[in-house]
Amino acid sequence: MTIALGKFTKDEKDLFDIMDDWLRRDRFVFVGWSGLLLFPCAYFALGGWFTGTTFVTSWYTHGLASSYLEGCNFLTAAVSTPANSLAHSLLLLWGPEAQGDFTRWCQLGGLWTFVALHGAFALIGFMLRQFEIARSVQLRPYNAIAFSGPIAVFVSVFLIYPLGQSGWFFAPSFGVAAIFRFILFFQGFHNWTLNPFHMMGVAGVLGAALLCAIHGATVENTLFEDGDGANTFRAFNPTQAEETYSMVTANRFWSQIFGVAFSNKRWLHFFMLFVPVTGLWMSALGVVGLALNLRAYDFVSQEIRAAEDPEFETFYTKNILLNEGIRAWMAAQDQPHENLIFPEEVLPRGNAL
């Protein structure tokens, strides 16, 4: 029996091969198969955001002005979430709410669902782009894995959280001041800053910033002075084969500073990857918990003692009072459709009053 070894070659290219050749061609801006998802979705998400912040009011959904046309600036303009009465409707332009009327669609908050969904798929497309290019140039896919952190946060905050609540209304609107309002809402209604998942997220993000600063400074401190140039940027050939800084010197330095130091570059750089990505993922998991209205830490014994003893107060009990204030003041302002009216006696006051 004869076994023929060799690569099977087709006589003529089919449509897939033709598209593959064109999409993955070496050009100034790589397109790739991921580009079929990334570029249209990113274009529509950004275009929808610029359109909404420029022209579209939030009067019908939040009772607010939210566009440049109404007098907002870059910090106060936003693409606002749909009204609470629309629940979790996808708000398709041709759906039963807008019925093909573009103006009405914008008034109802259709641009928010448009931007949120296209934005989510654009982020996923960008991660797939990193996978695709890494595979093409034979790199490992850790860039794409790292980018899963921001995707997890976006999806949990903008999609999963409102899905767990009564509607898209409770998601963040796409704007700077709108995000700040959402943060205050999270604190007042969920005590988010005392949530351990938020603590891990803060530790991850700030820890990553510290690691970046330390790493950059250490590399700059231990550069080999073997170039002719006068400064860092002129002294080295970008194609040189040898390393540009001394890991041994850096190790000795930090061993003296802390008593411990990274002994190899692989562990060092993996740690720099692990800290922020894990922090972002933990924060995203915490937001999923909030979508289900899971409580954070409750130190009930301190609350009971503070209620019984006017002279006993902790930073925790002070924060609980602040949260009650946020809820009492924000609920009426933020959910005008509920017609909430709080009598004076239920508004929170300090223990001393």
From Swiss-Prot:
It is found in: Plastid, Chloroplast thylakoid membrane. The keyword Transmembrane helix applies. It is a multi-pass membrane protein. Fe cation binds at residues 215, 269. PSII is composed of 1 copy each of membrane proteins PsbA, PsbB, PsbC, PsbD, PsbE, PsbF, PsbH, PsbI, PsbJ, PsbK, PsbL, PsbM, PsbT, PsbX, PsbY, PsbZ, Psb30/Ycf12, at least 3 peripheral proteins of the oxygen-evolving complex and a large number of cofactors. It forms dimeric complexes. 2 of the reaction center chlorophylls (ChlD1 and ChlD2) are entirely coordinated by water. HAMAP family: PSII_PsbD_D2. This is Photosystem II D2 protein. It comes from Oenothera argillicola.
